[in-house]
A protein has these predicted regions:
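Beta-propeller-forming repeat regions
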Residues: 1-208
Length: 208
């Protein structure tokens, strides 16, 4: 698939007690490809064949007790896409895709993907891209009615509603309540606070 191995991870995707192998291949200086292998038949079998990616995450987003795979990549126009692979009739298949705001360049450097929980307890992926260390944009991916959706993507603008100055903070459970919060820096009105880098407070938001 590629000229060299970039990364290797082990995950029990089908929860049968045997781990699958997720291999990131370095195709060239600008392109990575992800393959997923299983040994359930005693011989290596490729479940996902060399799909391009920048980041990926494994989680049980549809809460069926099995693990799914979300692959973040660029489409032919360079737009960010999240591909959702899940188990269907004992086959690991691409089920659906969702648009994300961040470009692959914004994800590859300071960007992060975090597994978390929405306000109603639904599992989700929090995808944060960083633009030139100045701005951060967060997309939230979750599964509704079997489809992967980006709950922060605006139907009007086509981008996430969660865009803020970058403060080196990322989504986390900041108050220990089991729900993942998204940081949003806000400038503090104060005397002398007129420079290019004003003092800011950090507001933390939950979503559902």
């Amino acid at each position: 698939t590629g000229t060299s191995i970039y990364s290797i991870a082990y995950e029990d995707l089908d929860q049968d007690g045997r781990k699958e192998l997720l291999v990131g291949w370095r195709v060239n200086t600008d392109l990575l490809a992800l393959s997923v292998y299983t040994l359930r038949s005693g011989e290596p079998e490729e479940l996902v064949q060399g799909t391009s990616y920048v980041k990926y995450a494994v989680n049980d987003l549809n809460q069926d007790g099995l693990w799914e795979l979300v692959v973040l990549r660029a489409d032919e126009e360079g737009n960010g896409i999240a591909d959702y692979y899940c188990w269907q009739e004992e086959e690991f298949q691409l089920r659906t895709s969702a648009r994300i705001t961040s470009t692959m360049a914004e994800l590859s450097q300071q960007g992060r993907v975090k597994s978390g929980v929405l306000q109603d307890g639904t599992p989700a992926l929090f995808v944060t891209g960083v633009e030139e260390s100045a701005w951060m944009v967060t997309d939230i991916l979750t599964v509704k009615n079997g489809e992967l959706v980006n709950i922060l993507l605006s139907d009007v603008t086509g981008v996430s509603s969660e865009i803020a100055p970058f403060s080196s903070l990322y989504p986390e459970d900041i108050n220990g309540d089991g729900i993942t919060e998204v940081p949003h820096p806000e400038p503090i009105p104060a005397w002398g606070n007129v420079g290019e880098d004003p003092c800011r407070r950090i507001d933390w938001y939950t979503y559902t």
